[in-house]
């Protein structure tokens, strides 16, 4: 059974599990047809204390990434062609290192907690 959490519910679960002090917060859920976590956050996230949550609503887990400001430069990631102020992140859900298939960056280095719900 899948569970679709709202952004507010995910934020609350993060706070309840000690993940706080974020300046930029976003989440995405797995696109099961391609096994990709797909996200298009604003580029400003790169200069903020960024909490990026990957929601596996089938297995009911949240992978919580905390990415410090300026850990990734804008040129390391791909942007959307139609909205160049947005990043185009596609993380392979089958890759234990959470590799972005577009840029090759491994997001797993910023994984600090997995929360079951």
Q: Where in this protein do the model-derived segments appear?
A:
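Nucleic-acid endonuclease domains
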Residues: 2-117
């Amino acid at each position: 059974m899948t569970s679709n959490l709202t952004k507010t519910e995910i934020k609350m679960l993060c706070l309840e599990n000690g993940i706080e002090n974020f300046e930029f917060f976003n989440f995405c859920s797995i696109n099961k047809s391609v096994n990709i976590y797909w996200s298009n956050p604003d580029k400003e996230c790169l200069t903020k204390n960024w909490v990026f949550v990957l929601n596996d609503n089938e297995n009911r887990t949240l992978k919580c990434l905390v990415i410090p400001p300026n850990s990734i430069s804008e040129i390391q990631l791909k942007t959307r062609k139609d909205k160049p102020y947005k990043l185009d992140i596609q993380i392979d859900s089958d890759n234990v290192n959470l590799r972005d298939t577009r840029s090759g960056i491994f997001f797993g280095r910023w994984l600090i907690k997995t929360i079951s719900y």
